[in-house]
Amino acid sequence: TTCCPSIVARSNFNVCRLPGTPEALCATYTGCIIIPGATCPGDYAN
C-alpha cells in the first residue's frame, strides 16, 4: 500500500507511476511511503 501526506503528493505519485516508474522511486520522489498493511497512518492518509 502506498500512503501519501497530501492529495498533491498522491497526484504527483500517480503521474510518476504512469510511464512505469518503480513504485519505490516515485514514493521517494513525492514524499509518500510504502507500507506492508492496508491501513495508512493518520499523517499519510492520502
UniProtKB/Swiss-Prot annotation:
Biological process according to GO: defense response
Main location per the UniProt record: secreted
Keyword list, A-Z: Disulfide bond, Plant defense, Secreted
Coiled-coil regions, chain positions: none
Disulfide pattern: C3-C40, C4-C32, C16-C26
Annotated Gene Ontology cellular component terms: extracellular region
Localisation: Secreted
Family that this chain belongs to: Belongs to the plant thionin (TC 1.C.44) family.
Miscellaneous information on this protein: Two isoforms exists, a major form PL (shown here) and a minor form SI.
Biological function: The function of this hydrophobic plant seed protein is not known.
Protein name: Crambin
